[in-house]
Amino acid sequence: MATTAYIMIEAGVGKVGDVASALRSVPGVTMVDVVIGPYDIIATVSAQDMNAVSEVLANRVHKIKGVTRTLTCISLQR
């Protein structure tokens, strides 16, 4: 069964659109919503396991220019 993670993302001033666009091209990212609240974007990642989710976060999401902070929540049951 795939592992699903919800990533709350804070983007730099004026970078929300660029970050959201970049996220949409990341393999494993299945949804990107721009939101209002303490975070600017919520993205959903679906991957084979926790290691694969970690790879997406470390090697793709955190390297997007304009990402300043993230909070990741792992789904336990759907």
Whereabouts are the PLM-identified features?
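A compositional/biophysical signature of low hydrophobicity enriched in polar/charged and small residues
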Residues: 1-78
